């Protein structure tokens, strides 16, 4: 198992325009229903206003604006996997470049693409990593190939990039009908331990289920988020360093790779973007520590 501790990254370029709405202007009079962009987020007016900066007047009973979410261009850089940056209509590729300073790993989550190319360059333009991945999953047998829909991976993590003080990551996603990407993460990868059998995984469902007095149930489908309980083995010599890493991650989102095999056949269900809920370690003997890590995913 590995953990990717994310670092702040900056979008340098993108083929996706930021044209969801006009930019907010302090001198413009806005009416109810108007939409604006402010600091890469879309706001909708809930009251007439002039000079009311959206991020400062979007909460409480006297709010003038309601936050609707990130712009399409920056949806892949918010904290949520479910909000996707989608290529412009008619485009079959989505290309962007972000800073990759002092990073050793990156991950692309909740994407829709038939192929992905990632290129990492240092500050002098030297290519340190260049790989193209076909997202088609392995097919187990001819019957599945001919009679079942082909499946594709939706998450991909790479944790073996050489570190450079100044670097960039350029990604190109290709998909007929338009690619999309839910989250891009860059940071440092830390080995935690070896994932054992009896690891548990599931989801937290945010859908509503209301049943009235007559037994009629109304279901409202909403988002869900991954959750996992990882059982790990590690050597006692690594316990202190792992404890420091986990202590640093409390209350912060990170990418947890329960299966750090970066091939197509890895268990993607054990890849969770979320926060550390709890962990405990048991020193079984002089050469073995058993550790439980509970992670709750972000939707």
Report residues per predicted region.
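Tryptophan-rich substrate-binding surfaces of secreted polymer-degrading and adhesive proteins
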Residues: 1-85
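Extracellular/virion structural assembly segments
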Residues: 1-10, 14-15, 70-91, 101-299
């Amino acid at each position: 198992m590995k953990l990717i501790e994310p670092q702040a990254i900056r979008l340098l370029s993108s083929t996706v325009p930021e044209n969801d709405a006009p930019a907010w202007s302090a001198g413009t009079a806005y009416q109810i229903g108007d939409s604006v962009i402010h600091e890469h987020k879309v706001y909708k007016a809930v009251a007439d206003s002039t000079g009311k900066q959206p991020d400062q007047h979007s909460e409480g009973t006297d709010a003038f604006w309601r936050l609707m979410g990130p712009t399409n261009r920056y949806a892949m850089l918010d904290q949520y996997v479910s909000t996707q940056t989608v290529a412009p209509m008619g485009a079959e590729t989505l290309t962007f470049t972000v800073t990759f300073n002092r990073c050793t790993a990156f991950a692309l989550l909740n994407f829709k693409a038939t192929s992905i190319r990632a290129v990492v360059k240092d500050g002098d333009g030297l290519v340190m990593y260049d790989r193209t991945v076909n997202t088609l999953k392995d097919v187990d047998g001819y019957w599945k190939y001919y009679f079942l829909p082909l499946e594709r991976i939706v998450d991909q993590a790479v944790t073996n990039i050489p570190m450079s003080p100044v670097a960039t990551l350029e990604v190109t996603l290709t998909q007929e009908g338009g690619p999309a990407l839910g989250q891009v993460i860059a940071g440092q990868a830390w080995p935690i331990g070896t994932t054992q059998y009896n690891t548990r995984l599931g989801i937290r469902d945010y859908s509503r289920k209301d049943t009235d007095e007559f037994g009629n149930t109304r279901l409202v489908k909403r988002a869900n988020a991954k959750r996992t309980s990882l059982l790990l083995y590690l050597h006692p010599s690594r316990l202190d360093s792992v404890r420091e890493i986990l202590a640093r991650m409390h209350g912060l989102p990170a990418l947890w790779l329960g299966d750090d095999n970066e091939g197509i056949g890895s268990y993607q269900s054990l890849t969770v973007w979320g926060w550390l809920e709890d962990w405990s370690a048991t020193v079984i003997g002089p050469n073995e520590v058993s550790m439980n890590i509970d992670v709750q995913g972000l939707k």
